[in-house]
Amino acid sequence: MARITVEDCLLQIPNRFQLVLAATYRARMLSQGHAPKIESKNKPAVTALREIAEGKIGLEMLKKVPG
């Protein structure tokens, strides 16, 4: 299992506060049943960080706040 680090994610979203918000929103979406954009058997939070690190998810998550 490859480990995900904050440094990998910061290359995609340089502001760590925005990174946390984007990962939180995406993890919430995943836990509500949205399909992941990558192949993953991890928990929603880890999957969200992996999606960010791979560039599949970015700051657009801050404009799509789940309701």
UniProtKB/Swiss-Prot annotation:
GO cellular component, one term: DNA-directed RNA polymerase complex
Function noted in UniProt: Promotes RNA polymerase assembly. Latches the N- and C-terminal regions of the beta' subunit thereby facilitating its interaction with the beta and alpha subunits.
Stored InterPro entries: DNA-dir_RNA_pol_omega, Pol_omega/Rpo6/RPB6, RPB6/omega-like_sf
Key word Transcription present: yes
Family: Belongs to the RNA polymerase subunit omega family.
Alphabetical list of SUPFAM superfamilies matching this protein: RPB6/omega subunit-like
Stretches assigned to coiled coil: none
Record's protein name: DNA-directed RNA polymerase subunit omega
Example GO BP: DNA-templated transcription
